[in-house]
């Protein structure tokens, strides 16, 4: 497959390689702009997986679901790929930009509008739940390709 490692300003967590450079791996004569676009979307999911895997490993917990919001969550392909990569349900917020909701909630707490966090959290509703459906073998193959591409970018060729 085609992989985009978007290290345009280096790679942050969990790689911590500020000098890494962006690269596209796996290009052939048969690859076109659709492959590069897909690789760009997939790179978002791979990077989220890298971080979630690190956090769940360190915390000793298992991720069952992830709440998401923001512009990229409109992309159904990306959300399905994210669910598959994390092997977890993706709960897409009905409110596209939850940052604004966060400001409203903080203001509400300051004014004692809500008695508890649970009461304020009820404002955030789920628009869509996306369940993982990719076979484990395919998931491992794709993610292994991503890890190899990242290792090449950061100079770990072994």
Give short role names for the model-derived ranges.
Residues 1-158:
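Glycine/Thr-rich phosphate-binding loops that ligate phosphate moieties of nucleotide
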């Amino acid at each position: 497959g085609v992989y985009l490692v978007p290290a345009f300003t280096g790679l942050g967590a969990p790689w911590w390689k500020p000098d890494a450079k962006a690269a596209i791996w796996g290009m052939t004569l048969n690859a076109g702009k659709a492959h590069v676009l897909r690789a760009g979307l997939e790179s978002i999911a791979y990077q989220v997986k890298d971080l979630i895997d690190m956090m769940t490993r360190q915390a000793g917990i298992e991720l069952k679901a992830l709440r998401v919001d923001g512009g990229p969550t409109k992309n159904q392909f990306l959300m399905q790929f994210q669910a598959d990569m994390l092997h977890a349900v993706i709960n897409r917020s009905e409110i596209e930009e939850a940052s604004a909701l966060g400001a409203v909630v903080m203001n509400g707490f300051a004014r004692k509008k809500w008695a508890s966090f649970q009461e304020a959290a009820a404002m955030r509703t789920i628009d869509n739940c996306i369940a993982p459906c990719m076979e484990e073998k395919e998931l491992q193959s794709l993610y292994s390709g991503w890890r190899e591409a990242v290792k090449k970018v950061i100079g770990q060729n072994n």
